[in-house]
Amino acid sequence: MTQRFSFELTATDGRARTGVISTPRGEIRTPAFMPVGTAGTVKAMLPENVRATGADILLGNTYHLMLRPTAERVVRLGGLHRFMNWDRPILTDSGGFQVMSLADLRKLSEEGVTFRSHIDGSKHHLSPERSMEIQRLLGSDIVMAFDECPALPATEEAVAQSMRLSMRWARRSREAFGDRPGHALFGIMQGGVTRDLREESAAALREIGFEGYAIGGLAVGEGQEAMFGVLDYAPGLLPEDRPRYLMGVGKPDDIVGAVERGVDMMDCVLPSRSGRTGQAWTRRGQVNIKNARHMDDPRPLDEACSCPACRSYSRAYLHHVFRAQEIIASMLLTWHNLHYYQELMQGLRTAIAAGRLGEFVAAFHAARAEGDIEPL
C-alpha cells in the first residue's frame, strides 16, 4: 500500500460538510454511514449486497473478533478483508465500549482492562497496545484508539477521571500504532455532556495528533436534546481538515441533525437490527411490517424506493414471511433499511454540495410528519 490516507472537503453548507476520504482500498464519500459487521458480517446480508446499497465502508468489532475467531486466526487466513470477502475500507472499533457493556468481571487499571468473555467466561486483557496489535492483525484501514467508556449515569468527577484515562490511553495508542502508511488512527473525544471536559479532551487529542477524530460517549441514553447540545459545539473543537466521526448514531433524524452540525461519519446497528425484527425505516418514518394492517396490502413498502424489497415484493408478502419466520424476511428488510440509510446519505451529500441543505432537511421532516400511507 503506497497511497496514504487523506481527507478532502469539497463543499460546505453552514456547518455541514461533504468530502472524500481516500484510502488504498477506495474512497469514502462523506457524510458517510457505516453498516456494522460486528463479527465479520452484516447480519442477513452478503457483502456484495451491502455494497449494492451504496455503502463505501463497513465497521468491524475488535472485542467480538478477538474472542471469536481471534485476530491471530484471521491474519493466518489473509486478513479481515479477505476473510469476510469485503474489498472496500473497514473501520474497527477499539473494543473498549464492548468490554464495558458486555464482558463480565471487569477489572480496570491504568494498564488496561482485564475481563471475562461473555461467550465462555475465558479471561482476557485489553490495553491500548493490545488493541492496536489486534487491529493491525485484522488489517483494518481505520483504527480506533483504545478508550474507556464509563457506565451511565455517572458523576461529573467520574466522567472526568474516565476522560483523562482515555486521553492517556490515546497517547499510548498513538505510540503503539506507529507509522503505517495507508492506514489511519482516530482519536476519540470523551467528556460526557460537560463542555469543559469536552474541550479538555479535544485539546489533548489535537496535541497528540490523529488522522481523524471521533466523538464518543454519546447515544448512550442521554437523549437527542442533550446529544445535539454537545454536537452544537463539539465538532468545532476538532481540526477542520480531518474527518469527524460520531460513534453509535443512529436514527435517521439523529443522523440528519448530526450532519447539520458538522459530523462526517456515523455507524449504528439500528438499520440491520430493526430489519431483523420487522421494523422498516422509510422516508415517512418507521413501519412495523408485522402489524395486521399489512396482511392484504399489495402495495410496496415505499413506492419511491428501488431496493429489492420494495421493487419486487408487497407489504402483504413481507408481512407473511415475518409471521412465518422465514429467513428471507430478515434479508429483505435489512436490505431495505440499509438502502434507505444510504439514500439518505446521498441526499445529504447532494444537498450540501448544492447549498440546499435547509430545503432537504425541511422536506425530510415534512415527509416524516405525514406518517405512513393509510391502510387499504
UniProtKB/Swiss-Prot annotation:
Its EC number is 2.4.2.29. InterPro entries: ArchSynthase1/Queuine_TRR, TGT, TGT-like_sf, tRNA_ribo_trans-like. GO terms for biological process: queuosine biosynthetic process; tRNA wobble guanine modification; tRNA-guanine transglycosylation. GO terms for molecular function: metal ion binding; tRNA-guanosine(34) queuine transglycosylase activity. GO terms for cellular component: cytosol. Keywords: Glycosyltransferase, Metal-binding, Queuosine biosynthesis, Transferase, tRNA processing, Zinc. Pathway: tRNA modification; tRNA-queuosine biosynthesis. Binds 1 zinc ion per subunit. Homodimer. Within each dimer, one monomer is responsible for RNA recognition and catalysis, while the other monomer binds to the replacement base PreQ1. This is Queuine tRNA-ribosyltransferase. It comes from Cereibacter sphaeroides (strain ATCC 17023 / DSM 158 / JCM 6121 / CCUG 31486 / LMG 2827 / NBRC 12203 / NCIMB 8253 / ATH 2.4.1.). The gene is tgt.
